[in-house]
């Protein structure tokens, strides 16, 4: 989603929210949470507060009028009723017979509410230096995690990774084979953004950075001589990330055409640009997601930018067998998150079984 549209939708939601949600928003913006994360949280609060109005828990007529006391006095049974509502309500999509949202969506909703309750009961300060209230009902609400072993998850993910030679083959396919299938009109559009698209995909595959970290890169963050980039990690921390050498020619080629192709001036600091009616802008995450999906589906299987991050992590672990190194590359504080990659790279286990 374009940044301007995202901010417009955020403002629309904020206009309907109670004062304490607006305070929460400002507090998390200072952390900083990304606008995308805050937008998703606001959507969850909108869903929750609409249920509060419908359920008769409050006499308020509008979301903005729901008093803080409603959240303070919310019971465990109330929250369980909300979860049942999510699980059983008919979906708006007329093409499905399924009732209720998925467990993943429910967990996301509860995560957003947990964040809000933690803020209200622990983080915020009133005039006396105390939180608004102390009772956190979300601590009593259990979440159900998707039942899937790490090995099963790894096997599912493995089918959507470009491992071994496939990393370079994917880039070569976009460069040489993909344009052969296009009409003259589509080819013109492809050629305009070819160097940029290849540079973005090469960077994701060569560094493992998150999509948000890639699109927020500025020119000053790129050091092609050292093959290092500076990114802003989750929580606002700056980090230096090494980039594999195979991405260098793609990044250099994009840089050579960036200013002229996208009409960039010195004031246009964003590294990856898009151009509309002669005006350069920072490329948005939604455009990259669509671009990666388009190329990957034509090559092998439709994937997300996050799967390219998984690809780099898996290849790096396969080469080093070091979870610490992989964790550092991905910007994780612990190696627990990287356990997944030890299961994806399980050739030793399979070889042992084949010898039985």
Swiss-Prot record:
Disulfide bonds: none annotated. Coiled coil: none annotated. InterPro entries: CB (IPR044068), DNA_brk_join_enz (IPR011010), Integrase-like_cat_sf (IPR013762), Integrase_catalytic (IPR002104), Integrase_recombinase_N (IPR010998), Integrase_SAM-like_N (IPR004107), Recomb_XerS (IPR023670), Tyrosine_recombinase_XerCD (IPR050090). Its main location: cytoplasm. Pfam families: Phage_int_SAM_1, Phage_integrase. GO terms for molecular function: DNA binding; tyrosine-based site-specific recombinase activity. One of its GO terms (biological process) is chromosome segregation. It is found in: Cytoplasm. Keywords: Cell cycle, Cell division, Chromosome partition, Cytoplasm, DNA integration, DNA recombination, DNA-binding. One of its GO terms (cellular component) is cytoplasm. Residues 169-354 form the Tyr recombinase domain. The active site is at residues 210, 234, 306, 309, 332, 341. It comes from the Bacteria. FtsK is required for recombination. PANTHER family: PHAGE INTEGRASE-RELATED, TYROSINE RECOMBINASE XERC. Belongs to the 'phage' integrase family. XerS subfamily. This is Tyrosine recombinase XerS.
